[in-house]
Swiss-Prot record:
This is HTH-type transcriptional regulatory protein TyrR. Homodimer. In presence of tyrosine (or high concentrations of phenylalanine or tryptophan) and ATP, it self-associates to form a hexamer. The gene is tyrR. InterPro entries: AAA+_ATPase (IPR003593), Homeodomain-like_sf (IPR009057), HTH_TyrR (IPR030828), P-loop_NTPase (IPR027417), Sigma_54_int (IPR002078), Sigma_54_int_dom_ATP-bd_1 (IPR025662). GO terms for cellular component: cytoplasm; protein-DNA complex. ATP binds at residues 43-50, 101-110. Residues 292-312 bind DNA. One of its GO terms (molecular function) is ATP hydrolysis activity. It comes from Haemophilus influenzae (strain ATCC 51907 / DSM 11121 / KW20 / Rd).
Length: 318
């Protein structure tokens, strides 16, 4: 998702935004950044949720205060409450990360990993900013903007009994859904170009080249690990490249199931009919990102009239 180091002064500059789906997510993030209400960011692993949360903090009025990112899955059950709210044992006091981040922002990465009992205490904190340290009856207050992330839509986790319904309703006010990489095809080429530039500079090699087949493969691949997987795959390929030219074989990825051709599918079909089938699939994919026929024609390097006729021929965009 990023092609450069994060710049707190310009927090959203590191995002590659060409697809309509990602444009919507980033624009919502820019608007929601200015509010103090809890923010929920949902998206698959590797899609950039934590980076988006960080950008929201540095775009907000809290930008000069602390930003604390907490991996909820990494909090031991027996210590999670004291890590969040602090602890008092005799004369010894330890503050939690909410108190430490007072007037700043706390990112709870993987909110569903918290126990249901701790979710109840978090709900109370979200309601009025109050909490009690473990081992103490005195109430404390902290002014913190809370951002939560989840790989799975929270409403599904509510149905599974993993997330409290009341917490979900408290969080489901400002929500950003980060699209999976396979749903942002228009971003794959600029992401790949940016990553290759960044990686080649780190490895101190010339930026590798690639052809159209390589790019089409990137766009066809499922990318279960999303942007993070794309980056790691290109890093590995650049580390092993021999002649400064990347090929499909350089990626060392399993062939996408959708790319496997079965002869039975095309029994009694002519070559023109088979080509037409794949042409229609390509147009459907690109039309989702370029609903303007003029922009689609420009992207595919053909005339506006040719694209309009093809869309009409295949019944796309009716």
């Amino acid at each position: 998702m990023t092609i450069s180091k994060f710049n707190p002064q310009k927090p959203f500059e590191c995002f590659i935004v060409q697809s309509e789906a990602m444009k919507s997510a980033v624009e919502n993030a820019k608007r929601f950044a200015m509010f103090d209400a809890p923010l929920l960011i949902q998206g698959e692993t590797g899609s950039g949720k934590d980076l988006l949360a960080k950008a929201c903090h540095y775009q907000s009025l809290r930008r000069d205060k602390k930003f604390i990112a907490v991996n909820c899955a990494g909090l031991p059950d027996e210590d999670a409450e004291s890590e969040m709210f602090g602890r008092k044992v005799g004369d010894s006091e330890t503050i939690g990360f909410f108190e430490y981040a007072n007037k700043g922002t706390v990112l709870l990465d993987g909110i569903a990993e918290l126990s249901l009992s701790l979710q109840a205490k978090l709900l109370r904190f979200l309601t009025d900013g109050s909490f009690r340290r473990v081992g103490e009856e005195k109430e404390h207050y902290a002014n913190v903007r809370v951002i939560c992330t989840s790989q799975v839509p929270l409403h599904l986790l509510v149905e599974q009994g993993k997330v409290r319904a009341d917490l979900f309703h408290r969080l489901n006010v400002l929500t950003i859904n980060v699209p999976a990489l396979r749903d942002r095809m228009a971003d794959i080429e600029p992401l790949a170009q940016g990553f290759l530039q960044e990686i080649s500079e780190e490895l101190k090699i010339a930026k590798p080249t690639f052809d159209k087949d390589f790019l089409l493969y990137l766009q066809k691949y499922d990318w279960k690990g999303n942007v993070r997987e794309l980056y790691n795959t290109l890093y590995r390929a650049c580390s092993l490249v021999q002649d400064n030219h990347l090929t499909i074989e350089s990626l060392n990825l399993a062939l996408p199931q959708s790319a496997v051709i079965s002869l039975d599918e095309f029994e009694n079909k002519t070559l023109d009919e088979i080509i037409g089938f794949y042409e229609a699939q390509v147009l459907k994919l690109f039309y989702a990102e370029y609903p303007s026929t003029r922009k689609l024609a420009q992207r595919l390097g053909v005339s506006h009239t040719a694209i309009a006729n093809k869309l009409k021929q295949y019944g796309i965009g009716k």
